[in-house]
From Swiss-Prot:
Lineage: Viruses, Riboviria, Orthornavirae, Negarnaviricota, Haploviricotina
This protein's name: Matrix protein
Protein's job: The M protein has a crucial role in virus assembly and interacts with the RNP complex as well as with the viral membrane.
Compartment(s) where it occurs, according to its Swiss-Prot or TrEMBL record: Virion
Cytoplasm found in the keyword field: no
GO MF annotations, alphabetized: structural constituent of virion
A biological process term (GO) from this entry: virion assembly
Organism of this sequence: Mumps virus genotype A (strain Jeryl-Lynn)
Pfam family, one: Matrix_Paramyxo_C
Gene: M
Database matches in InterPro entries: Matrix_C, Matrix_N, Matrix_Paramyxo_C, Matrix_Paramyxo_N
GO cellular component: virion component
Length: 375
C-alpha cells in the first residue's frame, strides 16, 4: 500500500505577465451579426543562443461547419451561404520559416480548404483532408500532409456533435504564431514516455495552472478553487524522465537525494502555444545519463498539454492561464514499485519569465489586425 507524500515547501513564484498564456479577445465584426473577427496572437521564445536558428510555429483555432449546399442556379448577386457552427476545433500547421507580415497571414486564410471527416479504429478519430493551403504556408509541415489523422478528443471540442452523412469544413478564425529557436522543437517519442521498468525510477512533473474563469462557470466545477480568488486551479502531469536506481545499499535515496539531482539539472518551465498549449522544460545543468534521451542536446523538451490532458487543453483554447507552481515527483517506474513506495516531491522548479514573455515584438498580438469576417 502506498504511503503518504513527502512535500518540500516552495514559495509561490513571483507574479508576472510572462508566466501567462492569454486568451484571444472576443471581437465581433461590425458587418454581419454574430461574426468573430479573425485575429493573430504572436509570441517570441528564444533559447538565449544567438547562433540558434529562428523558426515559426503556426497553430490555428476555429470552427467546424457543415459544408453549404449548392442550388441548381446561382447568380452573381447570390450571397455566400454560411452554415451554423457545429463545434470548435484546433489544428497545428507545424513549424516553418519566420513570417513577417501578420496582415498577409490573415488574408491568406481565405485560400484555405480543409475538410473534416469522422472515423474510428479502437477509438474515435478525426481525419483532416487538406485540399488547399495558401502559398504563404507552403514550407510548413501541413503542406506535406494531405491527410492528418488525430484523436477526436484532442482536436475537436465536442466530437459527439459530428454525425454521419454530413460534409464538414474547418474554418480558421484565430492564428497563434510563435517565433522560437529551432532548438526548442523537441518532443519525446511516445514509446519512450510509456515504457516502465523496475530498473529505474520515474520523474513526473506536475504543473499547477491558474485558469481564468468565473467560479460559477461550468468549467470551474472540474477544477480546484483558487485560494487567491483569481480563477481556478488545474493540475496537469507528464512524464519528465527516468533516473537509474541507486545500488549502494549504504546510501539513502530519499527526498534529499532527489532534491540534489533536481538542483543539478537546474530545471525551468514555461508555457507556450506550439502544438496547442505546450509546457516547455529546460534543463540548464547536469542531466543524468538515464535522463538524457528525454531532452535534446541543448536541454529542451516540449510537452503538449493535449497529450496528457485533452480536456484541460481544450479549456485553454478559450481561457487564459498562468503557471502557479511546478513540482517534480519521484516515483517507482513499474506499477509494483509505484504501489509500494511514497511519492517524493521536489517543488523548487523555476518558472522562466523571459521564455514565456509575450512582449518584445513590434506589433501588439492582441490588436485587431484586419476586419475580416469568419467565413
Amino acid at each position: 500500500m502506498a504511503g503518504s507524500q513527502i512535500k518540500i515547501p516552495l514559495p509561490k513564484p513571483p507574479d508576472s505577465d510572462s508566466q501567462r498564456l492569454n486568451a484571444f479577445p472576443v471581437i465581433m465584426a461590425q458587418e454581419g451579426k454574430g461574426r468573430l473577427l479573425r485575429q493573430i496572437r504572436l509570441r517570441k521564445i528564444l533559447s538565449g543562443d544567438p547562433s540558434d536558428q529562428q523558426i515559426t510555429f503556426v497553430n490555428t483555432y476555429g470552427f467546424i461547419r457543415a459544408t453549404p449546399e449548392t442550388s441548381e442556379f446561382i447568380s452573381e448577386s447570390s450571397q455566400q451561404k454560411v452554415t451554423p457552427v457545429v463545434t470548435a476545433c484546433m489544428l497545428s500547421f507545424g513549424a516553418g520559416p519566420v513570417l513577417e507580415d501578420p496582415q498577409h497571414m490573415l488574408k491568406a486564410l481565405d485560400q484555405t480548404d480543409i475538410r473534416v471527416r469522422k472515423t474510428a479504429s479502437d477509438k474515435e478519430q478525426i481525419l483532416f483532408e487538406i485540399n488547399r493551403i495558401p502559398n504563404l504556408f507552403r514550407h510548413y509541415q501541413i503542406s506535406a500532409d494531405h491527410l492528418i489523422q488525430a484523436s477526436s478528443d484532442k482536436y475537436v471540442k465536442s466530437p459527439a456533435k459530428l454525425i454521419a452523412g454530413v460534409n464538414y469544413i474547418y474554418c480558421v478564425t484565430f492564428l497563434s504564431v510563435t517565433v522560437c529557436s529551432a532548438s526548442l522543437k523537441f518532443r519525446v517519442a511516445r514509446p519512450l514516455l510509456a515504457a516502465r521498468s523496475r530498473l529505474v525510477r520515474a520523474v513526473q512533473m506536475e504543473i499547477l495552472l491558474r485558469v481564468t474563469c468565473k467560479k460559477d462557470s461550468q468549467m470551474a466545477k472540474s477544477m480546484l478553487n483558487d485560494p487567491d480568488g483569481e480563477g481556478c486551479i488545474a493540475s496537469v502531469w507528464f512524464h519528465l524522465c527516468n533516473l537509474c536506481k541507486g545500488r549502494n545499499k549504504l546510501r539513502s535515496y530519499d527526498e534529499n537525494y532527489f532534491a540534489s539531482k533536481c538542483r543539478k539539472m537546474n530545471l525551468t518551465v514555461s508555457i507556450g502555444d506550439m502544438w496547442g498549449p505546450t509546457i516547455l522544460v529546460h534543463a540548464g545543468g547536469h542531466i543524468p545519463t538515464t535522463a538524457k534521451p528525454f531532452f535534446n542536446s541543448r536541454g529542451w523538451v516540449c510537452h503538449p498539454i493535449h497529450q496528457s490532458s485533452p480536456s484541460l487543453a481544450k479549456t485553454l483554447w478559450s481561457s487564459g492561464c498562468e503557471i502557479k507552481a511546478a513540482s517534480a515527483i519521484l516515483q517507482g517506474s513499474d506499477y509494483a514499485s509505484l504501489a509500494k513506495t511514497d511519492d517524493i516531491i521536489y517543488s523548487k522548479i523555476k518558472v522562466d519569465k523571459d521564455a514565456a514573455n509575450y512582449k518584445g515584438v513590434s506589433w501588439s498580438p492582441f490588436r485587431k489586425s484586419a476586419s475580416m469576417r469568419n467565413l
